[in-house]
Amino acid sequence: MKKFLCYINIKNLKKGTIFMISVDEALEKILSFIKPLGYEKVSILEGLGRVIAEDIHAPRDIPPLDNSAMDGYAVKWDDIKNATKDNPVRLKVIEDLPAGLISKKTVENGCAIRIMTGAPIPKGADTVVQSEDTISEGSFVQILNAPPFGDNIRKAGEDVKRGDKVISKGDLLRPQELGMLASLGRAFIYVYQRPLVAILCTGDELVDVDENLEEGKIISSNSYTLAAQVKECGAIPIQLGIAKDRKEDIENKLSQGIRADVIITSAGVSVGDYDFVKDALKNLGMEMVFWKVAMKPGRPTTFGKIGEKPVFGLPGNPVSSMVSFEQFIRPSLLKMMGHKQIFRPIIDAILKEDIKKKPGRRHFIRGIITCENGTYFVTTTGPQGSGILRSMVKANGLIIVPEDTSLIKAGEKIKVQVLYSSDLGVVR
């Protein structure tokens, strides 16, 4: 793994040397280091949205017995095969059979058993006639229509046969998987653990949302945005609060989150006199992997490790922080939780306006995706400043402009990373 690591000379950084790697290279370095966490035993309801860490095989057939798919009458098909409305067949009803009970009687020629949905098929019967095709006459019933032989009977093992693998290790547990687990009698299952993610925002100018907003101060929105992004992934955020621009305060706050599986810092990662995060992390034993990424927004994104713990340093600007999280931290957390699909979907969309940029960095431009007659279109949200949080509120995707591209004209196709897709018909 060490061949992927690129250690940075912090003294050179302080002198102004800037080393940037590509987005793809940064992601490769991160994901080569990230490994799935261990697993834990949870109840099946607690498993919703989690990734299962074991194969599940059926211990028995489902359904375990042939049973009725309809309310109606269990009969011998030979008795009723010629039944019509004009020439109904009259049978003697020998029993009423609710679901959950097994009949001790046998259906003989000329007889029927009234049966409820889910009730086991009684001996002698080979077909169920639905109630709508009958006329009840007390202890007799008239059959007005002959269904096909074997109709309305669910066979034993029709859903699942004993020994079948019904859920595979690595599958995401949705409500339907939980229903299947319940039907198999599994009250508890093993799932991948959810990472604890420590989040620290730094800056003398920051105050919390419930504090007095004095002149020159700003509310630390990143504390909540990042925590929400972590929760949306299914991981567990640990908010360490706000640290002042002093190495001792930053180091003290970071040490409180050392038990976490992942550490995220926001701000204090650029090259400057008041950027103390890198020094505090170095004192905690972090090895730096990279310090700058050739992307916009999000250039001052860092990645390192403290032992086997990944450490991400994000920019302080709200949009830069969110975009960097989407590109690097979200797939990392999903991989740690055992997910097979760790990336947002990327679609082709037709651009509705010209986009210009300087070549050299990959741009992630906030966009609004629409679907018109099965074709995707995208337009920007407007001004793209890295502090304009409202642009992320408007956006449902990120327009990806490659490093070597300087102009994309309206009408051309472009790749767009889908952030929110409920109205687009895109699988996330």
Please tell me what each predicted stretch does.
Residues I21-V23, Y73-Q239, G382, V418-Y420, ...:
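Short, glycine/charged-enriched hinge/interface segments at domain edges or termini
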Residues F19-V23, L27, E40, I44, ...:
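Generic structural signal for well-ordered, non-membrane alpha-helical segments
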